[in-house]
A protein has these predicted regions:
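Thioredoxin-like thiol-disulfide oxidoreductase module
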Residues: 39-57, 81
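Structural micro-motif
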Residues: 52-63, 72
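Short, charged, low-complexity loops and linkers
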Residues: 83-96, 164
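Short, contiguous alpha-helical
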Residues: 118-162, 201-262
Length: 269
């Protein structure tokens, strides 16, 4: 397979199916009428080879000639692609805390509805099982607390998967509930005096702690939307589904999945 040159000045987006920030990045460019070359790293092995020219092996990445921006920071993408980008408004920390708790509670509730035989089923066009998706929701919050214990957030922090003994429905539900308790304890303890304007030690660029918390909340929120979509694809109505009261005001993608057709889950079962 030939290697595509990236020295032509075209805008390229490197992404993978099911990645919340990847979907948001593509939607951002589409919304502003910016054409781009789509480079799905799960489908084209040469895509990662192109990223290696920049010393990168992560997504989402937007490149233009010999410069690049991490798609998780839209203001950097806007600068790279000559898109006007004004000030953004974030929800208060106290509200984000409530939203994250609702997301974790929802994840536990939806996991309780998942048939045991379906946990090992894979998401369409993504090597991630339904069980791993549920675990990932809780692990996003866990990565936030790791950061607060002095462990920097890396790309691999979000690529972890549970060991087999932690992949059962009961264990996954317990993990979500554990993270609700731990997050509440943190907010009632160290979180009370946290400087939310301080810089977060994250791999994707300059972010304040407030921005990192927002990323944590909407990231987990997008994946819980995917889990509800999974249930619908299995013919199961989500128990007390999360809606606008949980997601409004968060910078989430509009779509749930790159091709959000739950019937595809039924056809692939």
């Amino acid at each position: 397979m030939g290697t595509t040159t990236t020295a032509d000045g075209a805008i390229r987006v490197y992404w993978m199916t099911g990645c919340s920030s990847c979907l948001r990045t593509k939607e951002f460019l589409q919304k502003h009428g910016v054409p781009f070359l789509s480079r799905n790293v799960l489908e084209d092995e040469s895509a990662y080879a192109e990223l290696e020219q920049f010393g990168l092996k992560q997504v989402p990445i937007v490149t233009r000639g010999d410069t690049w921006a991490n798609g998780q920071i839209l203001r950097d993408v806007a600068k790279l692609c000559d898109i006007p980008y004004g000030a953004t408004k974030m929800l208060p920390v106290a509200e984000m805390r409530l939203r994250l708790d609702a997301v974790l509670a929802g994840a536990a509730r939806f996991l309780a509805q998942m048939p045991d035989h379906a946990l090992a089923q894979m998401l369409p066009n993504r090597p991630r099982s339904f069980a791993q998706l549920g675990w990932h929701i809780a692990n996003i919050a866990d990565a936030f607390l790791e950061h607060e214990d002095g462990i920097p957030l890396t790309f691999d922090s979000y690529m972890r998967v549970p060991v087999e003994e932690d992949s059962g429905r009961a264990q996954l539900i317990a993990y979500c509930e554990e993270m609700r308790v731990r997050m509440s304890a943190w907010f009632e303890g160290p979180g009370r005096t946290r400087d939310w304007s301080a810089r977060a030690d994250v791999y994707y660029g300059e972010q304040t702690m407030h921005e990192f918390l927002e990323r944590t909340v909407w990231h987990a929120g997008q994946h819980v939307r995917q889990f509800m979509w999974v249930l619908e694809g299995l013919g199961i109505a989500p128990d007390r589904p999360l809606g606008r009261e949980t997601f409004d005001g968060l910078p989430m993608p509009e779509k749930v999945w790159d091709e959000a057709d739950p019937a595809k889950l039924r056809r692939s079962a």
